[in-house]
């Protein structure tokens, strides 16, 4: 598919593939009221022939509203697309390592990524935006792995959990440096992500956005060297 507009007038699928099929979407607008694209074969989604927009129309509640859903032994490779107005932007229903996200623009979704129990997603470091993640596990047993260990730069991903624990606290998306994947864990403190500076504890441990700091922990901030001709004016908190 190299462009065009494709619309489902009912809650039926706009694009519905079968097992052992191969589908390449290189551009086009795809719109439906329920699940827009359901893949059971091998699918590549990119924008090599034009912009690719996957949009859920309306806000009906009688069935799930998803942008791209993967089932069975499907392999889904999302290199570039805009996914919007979905309850589940990318829904990995089956096959734990079946979805690879290289890049996408998420817009007005309730959950950008939705993972059924025991499912993961591969997110490459070419994805630099923020994505919200929700899992179907009930209850959630932590640590709950959410990304595979197949891609580099997992510690740099901007992932936010849309799940809460029994106390109403949103789970923290931590990083397993040994096994190279992101996982959900209870929130026990705060994170310090210093920009143009270094944040340390006890003068040795460097903090980043995947490291929690217990409440009350003294943190030392050290500004980076100012560019030539400029001076350090002060700190700004966000």
Per-range role (PLM):
Residues 186-238:
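Secondary-structure capping and domain/repeat boundary segments
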Residues 20, 40-42, 48, 73, ...:
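Tight coil/turn sites that cap or link beta-strands
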Residues 17, 39, 70, 92-95, ...:
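Hydrophobic beta-strand core residues of beta-sandwich domains
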Residues 45, 78, 101, 217-226:
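A short, solvent-exposed beta-strand micro-motif common in secreted/extracellular proteins
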Residues 1-13, 22, 26-36, 46-65, ...:
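Beta-strand-rich solenoid/repeat architectures in extracellular/passenger domains
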Residues 168-187:
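N-terminal capping/linker segments that flank leucine-rich repeat
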Residues 147-174, 218-238:
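Surface-exposed interfaces of beta-sheet-rich extracellular modules
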Residues 23, 43, 76, 179-182:
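Hydrophobic residues embedded in beta-strands of well-ordered beta-sheets
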């Amino acid at each position: 598919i190299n462009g065009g507009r494709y619309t489902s007038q009912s809650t039926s699928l706009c694009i519905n593939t079968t097992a052992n099929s191969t589908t390449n979407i290189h551009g086009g607008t795809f719109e439906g009221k329920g699940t827009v694209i359901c893949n059971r074969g091998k699918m590549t989604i990119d924008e090599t022939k034009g912009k690719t927009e996957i949009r859920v129309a309306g806000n009906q509640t009688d069935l799930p509203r998803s942008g791209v859903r993967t089932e069975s032994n499907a392999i889904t490779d999302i290199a570039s697309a805009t996914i919007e107005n979905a309850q589940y932007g990318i829904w990995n229903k089956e096959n734990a390592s079946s979805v690879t996200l290289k890049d996408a623009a998420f817009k007005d979704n309730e959950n950008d990524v939705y993972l059924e129990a025991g499912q993961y997603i591969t997110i490459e470091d070419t994805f630099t935006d923020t994505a919200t993640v929700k899992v179907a596990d009930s209850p959630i047993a932590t640590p709950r792995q959410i990304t595979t260990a197949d891609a580099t730069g997992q510690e740099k991903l901007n992932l936010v959990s849309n799940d809460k624990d029994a106390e109403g606290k949103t789970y923290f998306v931590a990083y397993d440096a040994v096994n190279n994947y992101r996982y959900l864990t209870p929130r026990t403190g705060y994170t310090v992500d210093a920009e143009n500076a270094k944040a340390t504890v006890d003068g040795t441990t460097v903090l980043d956005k995947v490291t929690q700091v217990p409440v009350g922990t003294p943190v030392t901030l050290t500004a980076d060297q100012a560019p030539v001709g400029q001076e350090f004016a002060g700190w700004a908190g966000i």
